[in-house]
């Protein structure tokens, strides 16, 4: 291979603070440490005081797809139909000994209806007694349910649910089972359990994390600093999100996702910085010099890692789903705050602590001497002797783990994500068992009826679609304007609706009141379909597709009928995500490539890093599908598989996993590059880089796994999926990728690792990562031709 000489000079005798922006920032934090610490204390105090009110500003929605049929139907039902409450609570009543025909049982139901109807925030209650509709009674007549319409905004509705549940159970005799379900009850319990799981995860993860940090640092002072940084980052971020939630819709998941990410990266970033600071002190630097050098090296790696994570999360903005964007905002915010704290607050604290960073040692633990050819140096040399064999073995493992990902199914979270003893889940299971799984999320079809829903021409259009639906085996029941009277013809229906709702027989009026917007022009007819399978099932999704693609056009209603409801919303959401996922992935990869190329002055290293991270993400996805969608981990992790992965998890996980995977890659490659610039020897640089970062990266990975596993141990399935996915991905990156693929691939690439065309090197902006070591001599590095 043709080579040419390239000289890279390291200035002699200059202070590290004079050679880099972060070095100068480090010098500033040393000189003004009390001002920096004071500013952070004030900021934390202010933000923490608002953080406690964040939950009240979060909503449960945001998963609707703008411009979709499902969203159009939802808005029409809310705005154009009288007494059609957008949110309801469903109260199930079951008596094993009596039926609804028993006066005593009926009295119980009527008493529940009266008490629930009197709860502030309940706009009305429908039941078998009030409507006479047989749809409210199970086939064995031992179960019925009531529908309570909730008024007010979303937070008011969620606050009303516990009162509805309490009123429903008040004074009910033993033997009568009363449960409260529905969307509002589901999200009320979801919020409460989410809050509890977050607190539990923090209580569990921090003590274990402290133990890991003590093993890594052998000093209580050094071990406490990363936890301090994580808590500060999280407290400031949650306070900031309180204000952001006041100007934009934020989903309830934002608290947990921000916490998962914030605790992990906050501790990791601090661990990298504290480790380097201690190394510089052991090299004989003064505290005043060690801080700027630390920021000029590990501080830069932290900033680059944070930027990569933020870039990856920013890809979620390409999907036009508000819930995704709110989770991205929360996670990006906590990463940005963690980076800012790691390069300002932490250096100020380190300058104050100084050599005390190594005090309060644990007697039984001894600090490991820096340098030398230890285990990881010898391991890297062994890998680089047979790179192809180790690459092949690692690839086989990663590909096998990724295989299940090919069969991934996305779905909206259902009641099964709640613990088995929660009332909304019990109510949903009762409804599914007695009335059909689809009753908890019926399909809603709105048909345009210009001139009035009760005209014969419009009734004929509605009837064609109704008959097509009744003939589909996936539908259990179909309610429409032409299905309320057995064996009635269109002429009879036309006479029935000739005078609008006012002309309908009073006994029949409750059954047809919601089947058209009678008091708002009667220009919309409604068809409600209960599916045989659950709303999130493939069978229900198939019915939505048939209605849209076959039944509506065949009925002559193309462009005049829209399909909504839970299944349609899930289908629209899944397809929006699937359609945008390639755009998100390519955008994140492209931006990450540019960022890494600017930092490492190489086109080969970014390609290697991206390829390895994609392999680790794919393996993590495959494990998530096997454990949660296939149900392999039900008994171990304590959940009930719904046969799908929650719809927001893959996209969110890609952004987080890709960004976090880069943490270790950037930290390792930064050290390898330092050694390469110092020695000009690629293999020696790889071995030394792996050796010098091994303990830190292993400790950081253990911290991450601890934090993520604590969230995986929670009670909500979506966060189990996220916590599990993040934990296994970190394990894969810290083991297969860092210890096998990186040294093997870099050995094969040789000097091409550092290749960049000279013209591009001049044109591309720099994010310098060179060491700030004052004592490093100038080195002459031979690079491949064309660099």
Which residues are covered by each model-predicted region?
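Membrane-embedded transmembrane helical bundles of large multi-pass transporters/channels
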Residues: 1-57, 62, 122, 139, ...
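Short, conserved active-site loops that position catalytic residues or coordinate cofactors/metal ions
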Residues: 54, 88-89, 93
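Structured non-transmembrane domains adjacent to transmembrane bundles in polytopic membrane proteins
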Residues: 67-88, 96-184, 409-634, 666, ...
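Short beta-strand segments at enzyme active-site cores
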Residues: 88-90, 128, 345, 741
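Short beta-strand segments
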Residues: 92, 147, 275
């Amino acid at each position: 291979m043709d080579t040419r000489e390239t000289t890279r000079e390291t200035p002699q005798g200059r202070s590290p603070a004079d050679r880099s922006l972060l070095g100068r920032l480090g010098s500033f934090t040393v000189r003004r440490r009390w001002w920096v610490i004071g500013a952070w204390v004030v900021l934390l105090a202010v933000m923490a005081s608002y953080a406690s009110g964040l939950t009240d500003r979060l909503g449960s929605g945001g998963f609707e797809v703008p411009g979709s049929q499902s969203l159009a139907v939802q808005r029409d039902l809310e705005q154009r139909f009288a007494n059609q409450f957008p949110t309801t609570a469903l109260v199930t009543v079951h008596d094993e000994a009596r039926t609804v025909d028993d006066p005593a049982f009926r009295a119980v139901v009527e008493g529940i209806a009266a008490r629930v109807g009197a709860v502030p925030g309940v706009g009305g209650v429908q039941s078998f007694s009030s409507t006479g509709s047989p749809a409210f009674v199970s086939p064995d007549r031992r179960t019925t349910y009531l529908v309570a319409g909730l008024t007010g905004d979303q937070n008011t509705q969620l606050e009303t649910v516990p009162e509805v549940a309490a009123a429903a159970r008040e004074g009910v005799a033993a033997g009568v089972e009363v449960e409260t379900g529905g969307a509002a009850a589901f999200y009320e319990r979801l919020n409460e359990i989410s809050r509890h799981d977050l607190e539990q995860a923090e209580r569990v993860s921090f003590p274990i994390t402290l133990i890991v940090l003590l093993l890594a640092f052998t000093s209580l002072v050094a071990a406490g600093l990363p936890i301090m940084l994580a808590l500060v980052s999280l407290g400031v971020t949650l306070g900031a999100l309180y204000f952001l939630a006041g100007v934009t819709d934020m989903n309830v998941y934002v608290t947990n996702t921000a916490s998962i990410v914030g605790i992990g990266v906050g501790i990791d970033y601090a661990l990298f910085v504290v480790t380097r600071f201690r190394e510089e002190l052991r090299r004989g630097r003064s505290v005043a010099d060690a801080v700027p050098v630390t920021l000029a090296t590990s501080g830069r790696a932290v900033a680059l890692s944070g930027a990569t994570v933020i870039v990856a999360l920013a890809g979620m903005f390409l999907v036009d789903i508000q819930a995704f964007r709110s989770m991205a905002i929360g996670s990006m915010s906590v990463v940005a705050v963690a980076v800012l704290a790691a390069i300002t607050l932490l250096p100020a604290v380190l300058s104050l602590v100084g050599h005390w960073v190594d005090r309060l040692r644990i007697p039984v633990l001894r600090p490991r001497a820096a340098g030398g050819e230890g285990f990881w140096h010898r391991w890297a040399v062994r890998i680089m002797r047979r790179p192809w064999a180790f690459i092949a073995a690692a690839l086989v493992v990663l590909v096998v783990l990724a295989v299940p990902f090919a069969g991934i199914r996305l779905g909206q979270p259902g009641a099964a994500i709640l613990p088995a003893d929660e009332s909304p889940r019990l109510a949903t299971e009762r409804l599914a068992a007695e009335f059909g799984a689809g009753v908890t999320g019926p399909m809603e079809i709105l048909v345009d009826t210009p001139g009035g829903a009760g005209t014969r021409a419009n009734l004929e259009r509605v009837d064609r679609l109704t008959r097509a639906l009744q003939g589909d085996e996936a539908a259990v029941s179909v309610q429409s304007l032409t299905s309320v009277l057995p064996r009635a013809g269109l002429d009879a229906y036309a006479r029935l609706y000739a005078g609008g709702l006012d002309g309908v027989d009073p006994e029949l009026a409750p059954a047809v009141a919601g089947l058209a917007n009678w008091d708002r022009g009667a220009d919309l007819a409604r068809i409600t379909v209960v599916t045989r399978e659950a709303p999130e099932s493939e069978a229900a999704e198939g019915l939505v597709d048939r209605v849209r693609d076959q039944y509506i056009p065949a009925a002559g209603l193309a462009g005049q009928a829209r399909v909504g409801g839970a299944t349609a919303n899930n289908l629209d959401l899944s397809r929006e995500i699937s359609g945008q996922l390639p755009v998100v992935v390519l955008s994140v990869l492209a931006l990450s490539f540019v960022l890494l190329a600017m930092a490492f002055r190489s086109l080969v290293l970014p390609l290697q890093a991206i390829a390895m991270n994609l392999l680790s993400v794919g393996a993590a996805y495959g494990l998530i599908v096997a454990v949660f969608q296939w149900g392999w981990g039900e008994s171990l992790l304590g959940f009930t598989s719904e046969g799908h992965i929650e719809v927001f998890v893959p996209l969110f996980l890609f952004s987080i996993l890709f960004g976090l995977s880069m943490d270790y890659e950037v930290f390792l490659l930064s050290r390898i590059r330092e050694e390469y610039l110092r020695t000009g020897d690629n293999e020696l640089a790889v071995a030394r880089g792996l050796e010098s970062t091994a303990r830190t990266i292993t400790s950081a990975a253990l911290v991450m796994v601890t934090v993520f596993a604590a969230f995986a141990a929670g009670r909500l399935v979506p966060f189990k999926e996220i916590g599990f996915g993040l934990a296994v991905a970190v394990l894969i990156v810290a083991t297969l990728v860092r210890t096998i693929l990186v040294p093997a691939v870099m050995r094969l690439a040789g000097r091409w690792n550092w290749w960049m065309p000279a013209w591009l090197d001049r044109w591309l902006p720099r994010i310098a990562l060179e060491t700030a070591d004052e004592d490093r001599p100038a080195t002459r590095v031979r690079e491949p031709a064309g660099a």
